[in-house]
Amino acid sequence: MKILIPGGSGYIGRQLSASLVNDGHEVVILTRGQRRAFPPPLAGEGQGGGLRDVTWDARTASGDWVDELAGAQGIINLAGANVGSGRWTRRRMAQILSSRLAATSAIVQAIETTPADRRPSVLLNASGIDYYGNRGDDIITEDGEPGDSFLARMSQQWETAAMKAEPLGLRVVRMRTSMVFGRGAPAFNLLTLPVRLFVGGPLGSGRQWFTWIHVDDIIGLYRFGLENERLSGAVNAVAPDIRRQVEVAKEIGLVLHRPTWFPAPALLLRLLLGTQSQLLLEGRRAVADKAEAAGYRFQFGGLRQALEEILRRR
């Protein structure tokens, strides 16, 4: 199977590409830089798979990358500026949004120029569980109403851009992803750092619901979506064991043998982070109904199980 991964040089893209290549698939990373997304040994020989980088500008449907679409079976679109990098000034928020919309629009335009009988059959497009905004104690399935925060509006517009591939004959999966837990995962490293430094604890009230997913399961869901036509539309990429933030901090502390009694008041976080504080203070009790109904089985469904695998692994 030949798979294109725009934005595949980030954390999830690297893990996903390695998994696909090791199982014999051909992976083409679309990257804006000239440097390889992986050191050569990571590409591996697998069972006949391969890994290539192809340059694109992530804005226009032109260049050699467009030719790669013909004969590919799927596209996994991860392209977009890092949400967690840099303070959210107006300029930065505009960049976060425009980078996603421009890249996705370019992909859809390129699909349209590809002969219908040579087009990929599926587009798996990243999105965020923040789509739903701050929802308190409501249990949220994929049919939940969208929120009105910056991240919610961004996710809505991103998904709308991706859905334009449906009239072109592609099955579109919108992967509403929660915080990815994994060894070396940037957001997870930031989450656990205060606990490691003995200053972990509740963020704001700590009662906001905290959704998460182990890196092996976000990879598993993307691969499941590639291969299973039963999965389409919005998918909540969240582990079944949903906790309040204060409970997550406590579990991290138990695994790391650290106290978690040091609170970070909401007012302080808003003063320090501005709009970006919504990443820490807003919560949603989202459940993975659609993925589980389609037959996906989580490898790391429990919070303690996931934390021990990541934090105690040598």
For the regions a language model picked out, list residue spans one by one.
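N-terminal Rossmann NAD(P)H-binding glycine-rich loop of SDR-like oxidoreductase domains
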Residues: 3-23
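Mid/C-terminal beta-alpha module of Rossmann-like enzyme folds, strongest
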Residues: 225-275, 308-314
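NAD(P)H-binding glycine-rich loop region in Rossmannoid oxidoreductase-like domains
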Residues: 52-103
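Conserved Rossmann-fold NAD(P)-dependent oxidoreductase catalytic core, especially the SDR/UDP-sugar
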Residues: 93, 105-149
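A conserved pocket-lining segment of Rossmann-fold NAD(P)-dependent short-chain dehydrogenase/reductase
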Residues: 190-217, 221-224
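Glycine/proline-rich active-site loop of Rossmann-fold NAD(P)-dependent oxidoreductases
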Residues: 156, 180-190, 225-235
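C-terminal amphipathic/interface module of NAD(P)-dependent oxidoreductases
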Residues: 278-314
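Conserved beta-loop-beta element that borders a ligand/cofactor-binding pocket
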Residues: 127-128, 160-183
